[in-house]
Every structure is written in structure tokens, then in C-alpha cells.
Regions:
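Active-site-adjacent structural elements that line small-molecule/cofactor binding pockets in enzymes
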Residues: 1-332
């Protein structure tokens, strides 16, 4: 199966910018366009619908929505809307969500909550009126969407790092995304974690695609690109660094980076991140350096590499360099 290359966009841009970036990405040959679902940014459906109208080939989806801040029936509706607007190119990305404590949202029973949300979403898309009674969510018998959908079964991606989340993906998902990682050593770890769930469901673990995506900054000035990547990755490091069992972090690095980020000093936080750590959690440098990082993931069997925001010293420059100078270097 051909490896896909995608772009991950942050939803912080003016109207019109998403369409322009999406058209450029499709022309360059990217396969998938993802919009993040990070707290307090624009809802992903806005940029996704704009990009759907501007493209005709690429797959589109949010990575990820969460069933704590958005009810499953609303997730089903937004997925159906995107699939209609894109004529069948949408996928659903679901995860437990991050930073929701800032808005007072507890996240109990995440595995059950995600699995039942998936049940509700796909029952609604299939037109199943039989009802559903779960431990977290339910549908009364007869409850159904009041419009025709494009497809009853858009692909499902789950965002997860840990053994239990990956096992759930192995049972029910088409893809698993390890967000915030550019580390090829995580791929066999995730594959084994998927295997436990896949075997339980009678599935081949190879049927579940592994997606790795991370902050990306590419430029012909490699040092400037890596400096910007350090600043960008600092806010995510405290979230994901301790989830990677293959990386040994310098003493107190995550704590010190987190304290500086909390104080609004992202550049100072980024300067603490050494090269070897940066390369595990971001794609950065010259086109040749970024291509080498992506190729390392392809060589260990990922289904998709996702180059995340901000792409370059500017979005437009980054997307252009990724398409014109990185994609041609990849063997897939």
C-alpha cells in the first residue's frame, strides 16, 4: 500500500487562507489535509468546509474531535456535512482531547466514552433506528438523522499513544494517529499495542494504518527552521514527551520547559530543547533534513506521515517547500 503524505493545519487563519493552502497542497501532490482540534482555536469544521470546496482529490478530516466537548450526534452531523461537501473524502478523527481542564470539562472513562461515541456516530450515519444504550451515551429507538448522508462509513482514525487506546484502535479503527511524534522508534511500539486489540477482534494488525505527525518547520535556512521548531514544539513537549517510552529525557527538561511555557516564554523554553530531543518530536531543518526524517518513518512502515503546522517560517513558504523540495525526495 502506498504511503500517504499529509499536512496538518492549525485553525487560526483568516477566511480564504485555508482554501489557498489546500489548493497549493493538492497541486503539489499531498494526499490528506487535516485540521487540528486544539482547545480555543477555530472549530475544525470551518476550515475543513472551506478546503473541501477548494479541492477535488485530497482526503479531509479533523484530528481530532473529542466526545467531551462535542456530543456524538453533533460529531456525526459535522462528519456527514464534510463528507457531503467533499463528495466522499472525509474521515473522522476522535481522541480524548487535551487541555479541557482549562474549561472545566472532566474526562472520565475515556476508553468507554470514545468507543460509545463511535457506536453512536456510525449508527446515525448508517440510519440504524434501533437505539443504543451505553454506559455513557445513548440513542432512543427511532432517533435518526433527518437528511441523506454521502456515505455510512467514512474511515475512522483514533488519536492515541498508550497501550489501552492503541488496543481500542486495533479493534475498531482504520488508522491510529500518534500526534506530536516524528520518532521512528515509536512505530514498532504502537504496532505491538495495536496488535492486542486487532487480534481480539479477529483483525490483521496491518489493516490499521499508523500515522505519525508533528510540528514541522522547513526552510533553506536550516538553522532558522530548527530555531522556530524549538519554539513551536515547546508547548506540546510537556504533553507528549512522557508518553514515549523510547526517549530518555534529560533530567527536569520537561518540567523546566513546561514552566517557561506557562510563563509565556516559549522561545526560552525552546532553547532548552536539545537536537536529539527535537528530532523525536518535530520535523525541522532544510528540505533534505525533513525528507530524511520522513523517510525514516516510511522505512519502518507508517501508513501516513503528517507534516504539522507551521510548516515553515511562513505557512505558504513551508507548504511550497514541502511540496516542491521534500515530496520529490521521498521513496514510498
Amino acid at each position: 500500500m502506498t504511503v500517504e503524505i499529509g499536512l496538518g493545519l492549525q485553525s487560526d487563519k483568516p477566511a480564504g487562507t485555508y482554501a489557498r493552502l489546500a489548493r497549493a497542497a493538492e497541486e503539489h501532490g499531498f494526499d490528506v489535509l487535516t485540521v487540528f482540534g486544539d482547545l480555543m482555536y477555530q472549530p475544525p469544521i470551518f476550515p475543513l468546509l472551506e478546503m473541501a470546496q477548494a479541492t477535488g482529490r485530497v482526503r479531509l478530516g479533523a484530528a481530532c474531535l473529542n466526545p467531551y466537548s462535542m456530543a456524538p450526534y453533533e460529531i456525526a452531523g459535522q462528519l456527514a456535512a464534510l463528507d457531503l461537501a467533499s463528495h466522499g473524502r472525509a474521515y473522522l478523527g476522535l481522541a480524548r482531547g487535551t487541555w479541557l481542564g482549562a474549561v472545566g470539562l472532566p474526562q472520565p472513562r475515556p476508553l468507554t466514552t470514545i468507543e460509545e461515541a463511535v457506536q453512536v456516530v456510525y449508527r446515525l450515519l448508517r440510519g440504524d433506528r434501533g437505539g443504543f444504550t451505553g454506559k455513557v451515551f445513548s440513542l432512543a429507538p427511532g432517533t435518526a438523522l433527518r437528511y441523506d448522508v454521502q456515505r455510512p462509513d467514512p474511515p475512522l482514525l483514533l488519536g492515541a499513544w498508550g497501550p489501552q487506546g492503541a488496543a481500542l484502535a486495533g479493534r475498531i479503527a482504520d488508522e491510529i494517529k500518534v500526534g506530536g511524534s516524528a520518532n521512528p522508534d515509536m512505530v514498532p511500539v504502537i504496532r505491538e499495542r495495536l496488535r492486542a486489540g486487532a487480534e481480539k477482534a479477529g483483525r490483521d494488525v496491518a489493516d490499521v494504518g499508523i500515522v505519525l505527525g508533528a510540528v514541522t518547520v522547513v526552510d533553506t535556512d536550516g538553522e532558522a527552521a530548527r530555531a522556530k521548531a524549538r519554539t513551536e514544539v515547546a508547548m506540546y513537549l510537556a504533553v507528549v514527551a512522557e508518553l514515549d517510552p523510547t526517549v530518555e529525557m534529560p533530567d527536569d527538561l520537561v518540567k523546566r520547559v513546561g514552566e517557561l511555557v506557562d510563563a509565556g516564554e516559549d522561545e526560552a523554553a525552546g532553547r532548552l530543547i536539545p537536537d536529539d530531543v527535537l528530532d523525536r518530536f518535530a520535523f525541522s531543518g532544510t528540505p533534505e533534513q525533513v525528507a530524511a526524517q520522513a523517510q525514516a518513518l516510511i522505512d519502518v512502515g507508517v501508513r501516513r506521515v503528517e507534516f504539522g503546522t507551521p510548516h515553515g517560517l511562513t505557512d505558504e513558504r513551508g507548504v511550497d517547500l514541502l511540496g516542491s523540495a521534500v515530496l520529490p525526495l521521498l521513496r514510498r
